[in-house]
Amino acid sequence: MQGSTRRAGAMTDVHRRFLQLLMTHGVLEEWEVRRLQNHCYQVHDRNATVDKLEDFINNINSVLESLYIEIKKGVTEDDGRPIYALVNLATTSVSKMATDFAENELDLFRKALELIVDSETGFASSTNILNLVDQLKGKKMRKKEAEQVLQKFVQSKWLIEKEGEFTLHGRAILEMEQFIRESYPDSVKMCNICHGLLIQGQSCETCGIRMHLPCVAKYFQSIPEPHCPHCNDYWPHDIPEVYNPEKEREAGISKSSRKSLRTRQH
């Protein structure tokens, strides 16, 4: 049986299909990755014991290592949901996106990226991004076209849009962290807890240190009176909840149940 004889560092059809589908999606949440893994076993090796996800991905990564590619795990900056993306370790710049976008579209992304990294909030307004359209390299782009390109970035999970403002998707942070650190050394912000790149989060009003929202949630989880971990001054911000996959799953089941109930009622 294929599942019982495979060795570490060897890819089976299960691994290959998983990798191919992950490449198609670009980035997936952890629950989607687990579902994808199970699907691949069902298609290619249904009698095998499903590997632990961490072992399964480590096995693929050991093969991809020589190609400077890696399946990397991260979390969303707003609520700490685990995500996985296929990251090109050799090409960390915006040029990684070149196969999907034209030169002027990539330049628009660079402009948006710079505004986002430079901002205090980690967001750039669509107005500010569109005002830079005249400075783009390559073919001229109208503002209407630029709006459509920004939506392409959202659909491709490079950007997130919230109420007319844009920030980086977790995919962009996973793939471009090193590039961003090197390209914007004077603007880049780091989390005081995990020491990772920080685009959006909370900051201490006294000493200025910053923390990701999920890091804030975990750090202050059992502390009734939150104080800055650096200067010990009072932390004035609302403390978000720690991400709970079980709670989200229950909410999703409840939501789908209500939806099916409404369907039956009509």
UniProtKB/Swiss-Prot annotation:
Q: According to the UniProt entry, which residue ranges have a biased composition of type Basic residues? A: 256-266
Q: Which Gene3D superfamilies match?
A: 3.90.1150.220, Winged helix-like DNA-binding domain superfamily/Winged helix DNA-binding domain, Zinc/RING finger domain, C3HC4 (zinc finger)
Residues in RING-type zinc fingers: 191-232
The UniProt annotation puts the region (Disordered) at 246-266
Q: Which UniProt keywords apply?
A: Chromosome, DNA damage, DNA recombination, DNA repair, Metal-binding, Nucleus, Telomere, Transferase, Ubl conjugation, Ubl conjugation pathway, Zinc, Zinc-finger
Q: Which Pfam families match?
A: SMC_Nse1 (PF07574), zf-RING-like (PF08746)
One cellular component GO annotation, for this chain's record? Answer: nucleus
Query: Could you tell me which InterPro entries the record lists for this protein?
Result: C1-like_sf, Nse1, Nse1_RING_C4HC3-type, PE/DAG-bd, WH-like_DNA-bd_sf, Znf_RING/FYVE/PHD
Record has DNA damage as a keyword: yes
The answer to keyword DNA damage applying to this record is yes
Which BP terms does GO give this entry? DNA damage response; DNA recombination; DNA repair
Q: What modifications does the entry list under PTM / processing?
A: Ubiquitinated.
Which stretches does the entry tag as region Interaction with NSMCE3? 1-102
Q: What does this protein do?
A: RING-type zinc finger-containing E3 ubiquitin ligase that assembles with melanoma antigen protein (MAGE) to catalyze the direct transfer of ubiquitin from E2 ubiquitin-conjugating enzyme to a specific substrate. Within MAGE-RING ubiquitin ligase complex, MAGE stimulates and specifies ubiquitin ligase activity likely through recruitment and/or stabilization of the E2 ubiquitin-conjugating enzyme at the E3:substrate complex. Involved in maintenance of genome integrity, DNA damage response and DNA repair.
Instruction: Name the family the entry cites.
Output: Belongs to the NSE1 family.
Protein name as annotated: Non-structural maintenance of chromosomes element 1 homolog
Q: Which organism is it from?
A: Mus musculus
